UniProtKB/Swiss-Prot annotation:
Keyword terms, alphabetized: GTP-binding, Hydrolase, Lyase, Magnesium, Manganese, Metal-binding, Multifunctional enzyme, Nucleotide-binding, Riboflavin biosynthesis, Zinc
Biological processes, Gene Ontology terms: riboflavin biosynthetic process
Start and end residues of each stretch annotated as GTP cyclohydrolase II: 200-397
Binding sites annotated in the UniProt record for Mg(2+) 2: E27, H141
Pathway of action: Cofactor biosynthesis; riboflavin biosynthesis; 2-hydroxy-3-oxobutyl phosphate from D-ribulose 5-phosphate: step 1/1; Cofactor biosynthesis; riboflavin biosynthesis; 5-amino-6-(D-ribitylamino)uracil from GTP: step 1/4
Ligand binding (GTP): R250, V251, H252, S253, E254, Q271, E293, G294, R295, T315, T350, K355
UniProt cofactor note: Binds 2 divalent metal cations per subunit. Magnesium or manganese. Binds 1 zinc ion per subunit.
Protein name as it appears in the record: Riboflavin biosynthesis protein RibBA
EC number(s) given by UniProt: 4.1.99.12, 3.5.4.25
Annotated organism of origin: Bacillus cereus (strain ZK / E33L)
Chain positions of site Essential for DHBP synthase activity: H124, E162
Membrane-crossing segments per the record: none
CDD domains found in the cross-reference section: GTP_cyclohydro2
Length: 397
């Protein structure tokens, strides 16, 4: 149904337009996107004729600063925090509204010799400032356009236009597919662009390594940062893991209440201790401790989910009532840390098939699933049963 990111990049490099769709839980829309560096009046005319939306120009913060493009409003109340600057026309244009003059404004916006004084305000081109980090920070069309331009080796700026049906309603995926077929346009998703970047870019940095004696044995503790957020992760390494043989690995998501306070609501603490003990017995392995509290929703939201569970919701329903997916974790950063440690083949300590699929999606091979089941307690029987029934965990209860 959708094309590969590589196919879209090839078309963009040729000056063609692509369609980019975002998540159905976000704006749930598709935009025409082209590279600003290759924009022509013909492309602008195509967008306004068949897209019918607002023509905008996603740019980096650097462009906005150089051209003194101030935010359109001082207090942004847009639900998606779209970062409009003041609209502009190049001083050489007349009304600025024609396809030719809009293309001229965009071309001059990219001209390194242009200054802020070269543009009238307001105008008919609407620059948007992309967040640094692109779609890995904000999954919007603004960031997608700049990311695609950078992946093409072009100036980091794009031209976008929302696609609206002839009846005035927003075009959804079936409409967008028909549009792509009619005009022979490649169609991709922001979700796939995120996956592409995570797969092809190094996002983790090894910061520090120490010897860590524990109650379970002595490990090498290696601390990692990443370029996506402020979260810091740690790998506890035992023995020589560089032999090329499958290595026993536990990817453990942080659970303050279970790991530190011994909460009986979950089985996280016992799993953590059992994994360390098993790695110590084998004399070789890795425990990767990921700062993904509450399956990725954070500590306070996890406590809010617990409150809902006290009212009768299960762990999945509680997450969803708070507006989160059942499991918000992403395994891309963890996979990059494991690769940095030199691992390729894993014997994975887990009861969660999705964790296996998540790691294998980043070119790691799970040669064996090693069960890590803890005895159920009265306080967590319902929780564990929900993990089996709704999250597909492999447990014998």
């Amino acid at each position: 149904m959708f094309h590969r990111i590589e196919e879209a990049l090839e078309d963009l490099k040729q000056g063609k337009v692509v369609i980019v769709c975002d998540d159905e839980n976000r704006e749930n829309e598709g935009d025409f996107i082209a590279l600003a560096e290759y924009i022509t009046p013909e492309t602008i005319n195509f967008m306004i004729t068949h897209g019918r939306g607002l023509v905008c120009v996603p740019i980096t913060e650097g462009y906005a600063e150089r051209l003194q493009l101030e935010p359109m409003v001082s207090h942004n109340t847009d639900s998606h925090h779209t970062a409009f600057t003041v609209s502009i026309d190049h001083v050489s244009t007349t009304t600025g509204i024609s396809a030719h003059e809009r293309a001229t404004t965009i071309q001059q916006l990219l001209n390194p010799a242009s200054k802020g004084a070269d543009f009238n305000r307001p105008g008919h081109i609407f620059p948007l400032i992309a967040k640094e980090g692109g779609v890995l920070r904000r999954a919007g069309h603004t960031e997608a356009a700049v990311d695609l331009a950078q992946l093409c080796g072009a100036e980091p700026a794009g031209v976008i236009c929302e696609i609206i049906n002839e009846d005035g309603a927003m075009a959804r995926v079936p409409d967008l597919l028909q549009c792509a077929k009619q005009f022979d346009i490649k169609m991709i998703t922001i979700e796939d662009l995120i996956a592409y970047r995570r797969h092809h870019e190094t996002l983790v940095t090894r910061e520090v390594e120490i010897t860590l004696p524990t109650d379970f044995g002595t490990f090498q503790a290696i601390g990692y940062s990443n370029s996506l957020d402020t979260k810091e992760h740690i790998a506890l390494v035992k023995g020589d893991i560089s032999t090329g043989e499958p290595v026993l690995v536990r990817v453990h998501s942080e659970c303050l209440t279970g790991d530190v306070f011994g909460s009986c609501r979950c089985d996280c603490g016992p799993q953590l201790h059992a994994a360390l003990a098993q790695i110590e017995r084998e004399g070789k392995g890795v425990l990767l401790y990921m700062r993904q509290e509450g399956r990725g929703i954070g500590l306070l939201n996890k406590l809010r989910a617990y409150k809902l569970q006290e009212e009768g919701f299960d762990t999945v329903e509680a997450n969803e009532k708070l507006g989160f997916p059942a499991d918000l974790r992403d395994y891309g950063i963890g996979a990059q840390i494991l690769k940095d440690l030199g691992l390729q083949h894993l014997r994975l300590l887990t009861n969660n098939p999705r964790k296996i699929a998540g790691l294998q999606g980043y070119d790691l091979t799970v040669t064996e699933r090693v069960p890590l089941q803890m005895p159920a307690k009265e306080e967590n029987k319902t929780y564990l049963q929900t993990k089996v029934n709704k999250l597909g965990h492999l447990l014998n209860l």
